[in-house]
Amino acid sequence: MSKQNIDKSTEHSAGENALSEKNHTIESNKNNIDSEEDDEEDEDYDPEKKNEAENEGGVSSDEEEDNDQYKDGKTSKIPDYSTIESSTSQVKTRSQRLHEKLSNQSRFIGNFEVDSKTGLVKDQSNIDVNSIFENLKNGSPSIDNSEELNIDSEKTANSQQQQKQQSNIEENELQGPKQIKIQINYTFAGKLITETKYVDENSQEAKAYLNSTSNISSSNSNEDIPYRRSQVKVIRTDPVTNETKELRIKLKRPSLIDRFLSINGNSKKMKLSTLEKSRLDWASFVDKRNINEELKIHNKAGYLDKQDFINRMNSKRDDLYLQAKEKEKIRKQQLLQK
């Protein structure tokens, strides 16, 4: 037993010695590392060199770095933020659009702009009213400017009207004279004839057609339309009492198609007399040969023109006679009143 105790004690002492040696080596290594770091710091920082540089009038390295940064900031260009695109949407809500619309409407009264500060309509004229009022007070009115402005405005308005008239004339010349459609359905010499053509509005044929059709009724009167009853009277006898009873049975209402056919189906065709037909033929012949002006010149000495002239003179003489008669009555009444 004594030997075992001795062996255990020796082993324990040997382990403690090994641990102490390890701790000693670790502490020595730490001290060596700290000493090396202190040496490096001492080598980087030399206060004597710094003092010498300051005495010579130099600038320290920190100040040089600050100056370099300041110079770079001066020479650097101003950044351009216009190319930056925002990710936010520019869509307006309904309330924003309504508010913007109301604000724009409140700025105008009709076609006149309103001042936002005073709420009055802005003066859009170029006339200085205050200067004119002062000149009127002093007795030296200067209305030349206003007169010149009025003259200029009248000239511009007249020039615009002339330009419009010229443009309308040019358009009419390019488009040509206005044409009208002539469609005639008539019976002549026992035959049904239908003519459809386009003629100038100012032509003799168009005038003759309008004059001839004004005297002819192409539509039927209400008497030609057959009368349709809506109810029918029916008399029946009662077999028990032998009494007669009058019943009214409603008929079927005619449709719109039946009404249209009844009105247009029985319509009479337009009838032209030989005189009216010859007038239309003569007007078309005059337009084809372009002899309207020649006929006007030669017809001045004709019988019909002379009769028209005499009738005009007679009507004018009658008017003058009636006027003189009325004046005489008025003069007599005035004399009686006196």
Swiss-Prot record:
Highest taxon above the source species: Eukaryota
UniProt feature, compositional bias: Acidic residues: 34-46
Domain spans labelled BCNT-C: 251-331
Pfam families in the record: BCNT
GO biological process terms, semicolon-separated: chromatin remodeling
Transmembrane segments: none
Region of interest called Disordered, as start-end residue ranges on this chain: 1-102, 153-174
Chief localisation class: nucleus
Cellular component terms per the entry's GO annotation: Swr1 complex
Basic and acidic residues: compositionally biased ranges: 1-27, 68-77
Swiss-Prot/TrEMBL keywords: Activator, Chromatin regulator, Nucleus, Transcription, Transcription regulation
Subcellular locations according to the entry: Nucleus
Compositional bias per record (Polar residues), positions renumbered to this chain: 83-93
Quaternary organization: Component of the SWR1 chromatin remodeling complex.
Physiological role: Component of the SWR1 complex which mediates the ATP-dependent exchange of histone H2A for the H2A variant HZT1 leading to transcriptional regulation of selected genes by chromatin remodeling. Involved in chromosome stability.
Family stated for the protein in its record: Belongs to the SWC5 family.
UniProt-recorded name of the protein: SWR1-complex protein 5
Source species of the chain: Candida albicans (strain SC5314 / ATCC MYA-2876) (Yeast)
Gene that specifies this protein: SWC5
